[in-house]
Regions:
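Active-site helix of classical SDR
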Residues: 122, 158, 166
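Residue(s) in the substrate-gating loop at a strand-loop-helix junction
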Residues: 142
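Short, small/polar-rich loop/turn modules that mediate ligand/substrate recognition or access, typified
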Residues: 174, 179, 215, 234-236
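Substrate-binding pocket helix/loop in short-chain dehydrogenase/reductase
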Residues: 98-99, 103-111, 193, 204
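Alpha-helical segment proximal to the catalytic Tyr-Lys
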Residues: 127, 171-175, 232
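A conserved structural motif in NAD(P)-dependent oxidoreductases
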Residues: 208-219, 230
Length: 247
């Protein structure tokens, strides 16, 4: 039930970190993967990992915040692969700061990538999914979109918006057998968290009932579930992958 044989998955922000882990996980389940990011060098690394699993991988320099770039990218993917069965909207950025000091540019930059990007990619890919009367859209949100966080007004607003947008898309597309769900990760281990002082890491872990950072694979496993037929009766939901931070 967790197989994606003969499926084509489009993953944004696929060059490294969580996006790379998701792309590899979907390939492990049998999917061919269209990899989207602006970092061509790191994107090729992800492509190599997918190809090593025996599956097709193609790279696309898509700027998710630009409508023309997204439209061209989706058209190219549909031409190259013939279809898109799974869309994972993972691309995201942060520009943290207290709201009192946050510039309008920093607000716009985060909302443009994190929220507008999900809107643009979903809008571009949904037409083909509706026509084939099947598809799974998985949007990467965050527990910050559920609980808020000081110093992250732009990020919290963008991820809260992703959650609301996911529910709306689920309602609009369910009659065409296209599902849309969101994943809300908590603190996930990255090179950035690894570089933090041990005391800082310990304080962060105190907020997590499971007392550890999540691994990228923890999130990728949930994405695979939502992308596969194992979740055929699941739509409009938010699955928190946060070690119990949000209950």
């Amino acid at each position: 039930m967790f197989e994606l044989n003969d499926k084509v998955a489009m993953v944004t922000g696929a060059a490294r970190g969580l996006g790379q882990a998701i792309a590899v996980k979907l390939a492990e389940a049998g999917a061919d993967v269209a990899l989207c990011d602006l970092n061509a060098e790191w994107l090729e690394e992800t492509a190599g990992k997918v190809k090593a699993l025996g599956h097709r991988a193609e790279c696309y320099g898509v700027n998710v915040a630009d409508g023309a770039s997204v439209t061209a990218g989706v058209k190219a993917i549909e031409k190259d692969f013939g279809k898109i069965d799974v869309l994972v909207n993972n691309a995201g950025i942060t520009k943290d700061g207290l709201m009192m000091r946050m510039s309008e540019d920093d607000w716009d930059a985060v909302l443009n990538v994190n929220l507008k990007g999900v809107f643009l990619c979903t809008k571009a890919a949904m037409r083909g999914m509706m026509k084939q009367r099947s598809g799974a859209i998985v949007n990467i949100a965050s527990v910050i979109g559920l609980m808020g966080n000081a110093g992250q007004a732009n990020y919290a607003a963008s991820k809260g918006g992703v959650i609301a947008l996911s529910k709306t898309v689920a309602k609009e597309l369910s009659s065409r057998n296209v599902r849309c769900n969101a994943v809300a990760p908590g603190f996930i281990r990255t090179a950035m968290t690894d570089a933090l002082d041990e005391e800082v890491q310990s304080k962060m872990k105190e907020l997590i009932p499971l007392a550890r950072f999540g691994e990228p694979e923890d999130v990728a496993n949930v994405v695979l579930f939502l992308a596969s037929d194992a979740s055929a009766y699941v739509t409009g939901q938010v699955l928190s992958t946060c070690g119990g931070m949000v209950m």
